[in-house]
């Protein structure tokens, strides 16, 4: 089993589109089995990119939640004094208190201070995770975290574990990471055999990609890069290539900016469906990345499609 994580330093770089195209290309291979793990649990959209059909749904629980039993509460106010997050308010009738879930940090101070035992602790559901079939071939595992909830890194681990259960020894798991370099990204990159860094050819894209490179290096992961939205600025294209050369990240390919790519996605297809010269550029890039993955599975130190050692 080979795990490939696709990441970018910022949102909107084209990470999910490239990850979806790669997963479809791998699934189309003879004997190819691919699992797409959408680990952007705060805003998963892999199901849209791959036209997913849900076949399994499971709740995700993370830590305790707290509530106040109105009949047991005497409104003594001790819980309000103990709460440092202003999460406890008077009820609509003013005869008891209630906990505002969106403000509660689940520290348990209210539970410890209530003399009447009116505060109760329960296991709180903060999201769901899913398994789905797709119209393009790869199975999809993804999750949805409730707005304002934490533990996104743990939910990423749940998604990856479920993907691993579906995979076989010869499978490739394509992990679509969240943007940035935060906790869910670290959880997405952990244990990956290869990281594909999607670099948007813009000032913010290059700067944020450099931060991601530093993270990948600190985690001792092998990495290659794909440049996206090239052709808009020769200066930005050159700066992106220079950054990759200075950091020693092999460049697998470049995909120029083209509004037609958006139209392809809106029609329900991946970027592999576009024709013409743009289609050749996309296909060449995806094939180069796929070549690196196959070389790793064969225990080869480098990929002929890139001509550089990882």
Walk through the language-model features, giving the residues of each:
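N-terminal glycine-rich dinucleotide-binding loop that anchors FAD/FMN and/or NAD(P) in oxidoreductases
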Residues: 51-70
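Conserved catalytic-core segment of NTP-binding enzymes
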Residues: 116, 123-131, 154-254, 263
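Cysteine-centered iron-sulfur cluster-binding motifs in ferredoxin-type domains/subunits
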Residues: 67-86, 98-118
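Short beta-strand-centered segment that lines the nucleotide-binding/catalytic pocket of NTP-utilizing
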Residues: 32-47, 123-129
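Walker A/P-loop phosphate-binding motif and the immediately C-terminal alpha-helix
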Residues: 3-36
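Flexible beta-alpha connector loops of hexameric P-loop NTPases
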Residues: 144-152, 203
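Hydrophobic alpha-helical segments and helix pairs
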Residues: 103-142
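C-terminal lobe/tail of nucleotide-utilizing enzymes
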Residues: 215-310
């Amino acid at each position: 089993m080979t795990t490939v994580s696709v990441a970018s330093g910022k949102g909107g770089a084209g990470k999910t589109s490239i990850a979806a195209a790669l997963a479809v290309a791998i699934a189309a291979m003879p004997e190819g089995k691919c699992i797409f793990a959408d680990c952007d649990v705060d805003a998963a959209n892999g199901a849209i990119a791959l036209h997913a059909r849900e076949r399994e749904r499971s709740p995700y629980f993370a830590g305790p939640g707290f509530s106040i039993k109105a009949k047991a509460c005497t409104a003594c106010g001790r819980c309000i004094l103990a709460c440092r997050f202003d999460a406890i308010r008077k009820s609509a009738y003013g005869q008891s208190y209630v906990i505002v879930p969106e403000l509660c940090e689940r520290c348990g101070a209210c539970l410890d201070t209530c003399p009447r035992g009116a505060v109760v602790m329960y296991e709180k559901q903060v999201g769901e995770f899913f398994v789905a079939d797709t119209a393009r071939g790869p199975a999809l595992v993804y999750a949805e975290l409730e707005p304002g909830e934490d533990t996104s890194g743990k939910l990423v681990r749940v998604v990856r574990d479920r993907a691993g259960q579906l995979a076989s020894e010869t499978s490739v798991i394509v992990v679509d990471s969240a943007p940035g370099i935060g906790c869910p990204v670290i959880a997405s990159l952990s244990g990956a055999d290869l990281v594909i860094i999607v670099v948007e050819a813009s000032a913010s894209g290059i700067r944020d990609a450099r931060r991601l490179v530093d993270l990948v290096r600190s985690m001792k992961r092998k990495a290659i890069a794909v440049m996206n939205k090239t052709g808009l600025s020769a200066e930005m294209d050159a700066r992106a290539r220079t950054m990759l050369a200075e950091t020693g990240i092999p460049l697998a390919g470049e995909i120029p900016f083209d509004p037609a790519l958006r139209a392809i996605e809106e029609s329900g297809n991946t970027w592999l469906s576009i024709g013409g010269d743009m289609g050749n550029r996309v296909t060449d890039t995806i094939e180069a990345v796929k070549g690196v993955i196959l070389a790793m599975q064969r225990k080869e130190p480098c990929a002929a499609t890139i001509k550089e050692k990882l």
